[in-house]
C-alpha cells in the first residue's frame, strides 16, 4: 500500500457556491410588491402584514410600501407598511 497518493493527486479542489442569504431590504426601505426582503434557511424572521413566504422561507413583499422589522410573541416579524 502506497502511503503517498502519487503524482499530481490531491484531496482538495472543491468549493461550493455562496448562498447569498440575508436581509435584502432593511427597515424603512421602500419596496415594490414582489421584492425579496429576506432570504433565509428556516424561519429566523416570520412574515407579518403584507409579507408572504416562499417554500424556501424567503420573505417577500405582497404590496408596495416600506419595510418594518419588529417582535411579536417572541418572534421576529417583518411587515410592509403601505
UniProtKB/Swiss-Prot annotation:
It holds the Pfam family Ribosomal_L27. GO terms for biological process: translation. GO terms for molecular function: structural constituent of ribosome. Residues 7-19 have a biased composition (Polar residues). Keywords: Ribonucleoprotein, Ribosomal protein. The keyword Ribonucleoprotein applies. Belongs to the bacterial ribosomal protein bL27 family. This is Large ribosomal subunit protein bL27. It comes from Bifidobacterium longum (strain NCC 2705). The lineage of its organism: Bacteria, Bacillati, Actinomycetota, Actinomycetes, Bifidobacteriales. The gene is rpmA.
Amino acid at each position: 500500500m502506497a502511503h503517498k497518493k502519487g503524482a499530481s493527486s490531491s484531496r482538495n479542489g472543491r468549493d461550493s457556491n455562496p448562498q447569498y442569504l440575508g436581509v435584502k431590504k432593511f427597515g424603512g426601505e421602500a419596496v415594490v410588491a414582489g421584492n425579496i426582503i429576506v432570504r433565509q434557511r428556516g424561519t429566523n424572521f416570520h412574515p407579518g402584514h403584507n409579507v408572504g413566504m416562499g417554500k424556501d422561507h424567503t420573505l417577500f413583499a405582497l404590496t408596495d410600501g416600506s419595510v418594518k422589522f419588529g417582535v411579536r410573541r417572541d418572534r421576529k416579524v417583518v411587515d410592509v407598511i403601505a
